[in-house]
A protein has these predicted regions:
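Interface amphipathic segments
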Residues: 1-519
Length: 519
C-alpha cells in the first residue's frame, strides 16, 4: 500500500464495509511529517477509537483521547465522501472536552512554544458541542465553560478554496464572562453580558476584520454596571466604522462614524451625542455629584495627540446641570490644527476664550523647557532628571479669556473674571529663551478679589527675571497693593516684595532677600 494523499488510497465502493477498534498509546510527534505543528508533542496520548463504515462513509461512535496532564476528549464523529477534499462532509459531537490549567499550559507550549497570559487565567476549559457541514462551510455550535465564565458559540467557518483563507460568521454570547479576570484587571473591570453577531470574521494584515452587530446588556467598569450598549459596524485594519451607542440610566451616548487608532497616524471622522451623562454616578469622577452633562461633538482630524493633530474638533451645546452649584451652557468650542505658512498652528475659538499657538510645540515637553531654562541660572536648585524629555520647542502663544464660568463650573477652578484676561509669550529652546506676559485686570480667586494683576517672566540677557504685581481687596474694603520682583543668575536669587494700602491711614513695607545656592 503506497500512501501519498487520500486519492492514493484504494477506491472503495458502497458495497465495501469495514469496522474496527483501536486502543493505543500514540505520540503526536510521529505525525509531524504530515502535520508539522505536532513536532513538539512528545508526551504519549491514550487513544480509544471504535469505527465502522461503508464505501466513503465512516462512523466513529467512540472517540476518546486522554493524557496525564489534564486533557480529555470524548465524543463521536462521522465522515462522508472522505476523499472529496473540501466537499467532504463532517459531523462531530463532543460530549466532553476538558483541559485543566496544566493541560492548557502543555497544549499551548507544544503548539506555539509559549502560553498567552490570558489563557493562563482561564484555570480550566470545558466544551461540549457539535460540528457539522462540508469542510468549506462548517457550522460549530457549543458551550465553552472556563474559570472566567461560560461562552455560547454558533458559528459557521467558511474556507475560500482558492486562497484557503478562513472566515467566520455567526453569534458569540455570554451572560457572565469575567473580563477583569481575563485581563488581570479585576479592580477596574467586572463581568460582561453580551450577544454579538459576526459576519466574515477573519484576520488580514495582523488585524481581525468583521462586520459586528450586537448588544452588551451589561458591562462592569470601575465598580459600575453599564447597561444597553449597542454595536453595529465594521471592524477592519484596527479601526471601526459604524455606530456605538449606550442607553444607561445614568446617561446615553451615541457615536456615528469611523476611527482608527492602530494606524501610524490615527484618524477620526465621527459625530457623538451625549445626553444627561452623570460622571459621579458612573464612577468616572469623584466630582460632579448630582450633576449631568450633555453635549454634541464633531471630530474630523488625524494625529496621535494635540502635537501632531491636523483637522478640526467642534464641541456644541455643552450643558452642565448642577442643582447644588448652578449649571452652565457653552454654545460652541472649536479646535483647529494644521500647517500655516510651513508652521504648525493650533487655534481655539469659543465664546469664553480664544487661543493661537504657532510654531514647533510639544505639550508634554513644555515643563522640561521651563525647567531647563531656569536651571541655567540656578543649577544647584534644579536637577535635570534622566528621564526628562529633551525639549525642542519654538513657538509663540496668545490666549485671551473673556470669562471663566465654564472653567469654574466644569473643572471646578475657583476663578472668576470681571474683565477679560490675556496670556501671551514664546518659548525657544534653541536659543534658550522664554517670555511670558499675563494681564488680569480684575478677577476673584478662591473667594478673594484682585485687580491690576500683571505677570512677566523672561530671560533677555544673562539673568532670569520674574515680576508679579496687583492689588488685593481686603475684607475691610481697603485695597492692598503688592509687587514681587525676582532675579536669578549664577545660583544667586534676589527677591524683593513691596506692599502698601490706599486708605486714609497708609502703611507699606518692603522685604528683600538675597539667596545663594550651593550643591
Amino acid at each position: 500500500l503506497k500512501y501519498d494523499s487520500l486519492p492514493e488510497l484504494p477506491q472503495m465502493t458502497e458495497n465495501v464495509r469495514y469496522d474496527g477498534s483501536l486502543k493505543a498509546s500514540v505520540i503526536l510527534k510521529d505525525l509531524a511529517p504530515f502535520v508539522p505543528a505536532l513536532s513538539r508533542f512528545e508526551e504519549p496520548l491514550d487513544l480509544n477509537l471504535v469505527f465502522s463504515g461503508h464505501g466513503k462513509h465512516l462512523d466513529c461512535p467512540t472517540l476518546r483521547l486522554t493524557n496525564h496532564h489534564g486533557l480529555m476528549i470524548a465524543g463521536e464523529a462521522a465522515l462522508s465522501n472522505w476523499d472529496a477534499g473540501m466537499d467532504m462532509y463532517i459531523y462531530g459531537k463532543l460530549g466532553n472536552l476538558t483541559m485543566t490549567k496544566e493541560g492548557i499550559n502543555v497544549l499551548m507550549t507544544n503548539l506555539t512554544g509559549k502560553v498567552p497570559p490570558i489563557l493562563q487565567r482561564l484555570d480550566y476549559i470545558r466544551f461540549n458541542g457539535e460540528a457539522a457541514g462540508y469542510l468549506h462551510d462548517l457550522t460549530l455550535t457549543g458551550l465553552f465553560y472556563t474559570g472566567a465564565g461560560m461562552v455560547k458559540t454558533d458559528v459557521m467557518m467558511s474556507i475560500d478554496e482558492q486562497s484557503m483563507s478562513r472566515t467566520y460568521s455567526g453569534s458569540v454570547a455570554s451572560a457572565d464572562l469575567d473580563l477583569g479576570k481575563l485581563l488581570n484587571q479585576e479592580k477596574k473591570f467586572g463581568k460582561v453580558d453580551f450577544n454579538v453577531e459576526l459576519k466574515g470574521f477573519n484576520y488580514k494584515n495582523r488585524y481581525p476584520e468583521s462586520y459586528i452587530k450586537g448588544i452588551i446588556s451589561s458591562f462592569e467598569y470601575s465598580q459600575y454596571q453599564y447597561e444597553n450598549i449597542m454595536l453595529d459596524g465594521v471592524y477592519k485594519d484596527g479601526g471601526f466604522n459604524g455606530r456605538l451607542s449606550m442607553d444607561d440610566a445614568n446617561g446615553s451616548v451615541q457615536i456615528d462614524g469611523n476611527f482608527n487608532v492602530a494606524k501610524t497616524i490615527p484618524d477620526f471622522n465621527l459625530k457623538a451625542s451625549v445626553k444627561n451623562l452623570r460622571p459621579h454616578d458612573l464612577h468616572l469622577s469623584d466630582k460632579y455629584e448630582n450633576a449631568s452633562i450633555s453635549l454634541d461633538l464633531t471630530a474630523d482630524f488625524t494625529g496621535k495627540s494635540i502635537d501632531d493633530m491636523n483637522g478640526r474638533i467642534s464641541l456644541d451645546s455643552l450643558q452642565l446641570n448642577a442643582p447644588d452649584e448652578g449649571g452652565c451652557f457653552l454654545d460652541n468650542l472649536t479646535i483647529t490644527a494644521g500647517q500655516v505658512s510651513g508652521e504648525k498652528e493650533l487655534r481655539i475659538n469659543s465664546s469664553f476664550m480664544t487661543a493661537v499657538i504657532r510654531g514647533d510645540y510639544s505639550y508634554h515637553t513644555i515643563p522640561a523647557s521651563v525647567v531647563k531654562t531656569v536651571q541655567r541660572y540656578i543649577p544647584s536648585l534644579l536637577t535635570i532628571k534622566d528621564n526628562m524629555p529633551e525639549p525642542h520647542n519654538n513657538f509663540q502663544f496668545d490666549i485671551c479669556l473673556e470669562n471663566t464660568e465654564v472653567l469654574s463650573k466644569l473643572f471646578q477652578i475657583p476663578l472668576e473674571l470681571y474683565l477679560p484676561a490675556s496670556l501671551k509669550g514664546y518659548f525657544n529652546d534653541g536659543e534658550e529663551k522664554l517670555h511670558v506676559e499675563g494681564h488680569f485686570p480684575e478677577f476673584r480667586y478662591n473667594g478673594t478679589r484682585y485687580d491690576s494683576g500683571v505677570l512677566f517672566c523672561e530671560n533677555p540677557s544673562d539673568r532670569f527675571k520674574c515680576s508679579l504685581r496687583g492689588g488685593m481687596l481686603m475684607k475691610s474694603g481697603a485695597m492692598l497693593n503688592f509687587s514681587v520682583e525676582a532675579n536669578a543668575k549664577n545660583d544667586h536669587l534676589e527677591t524683593t516684595i513691596n506692599w502698601g494700602n490706599n486708605t486714609d491711614v497708609t502703611y507699606g513695607g518692603k522685604f528683600a532677600a538675597d539667596t545663594r545656592f550651593f550643591k
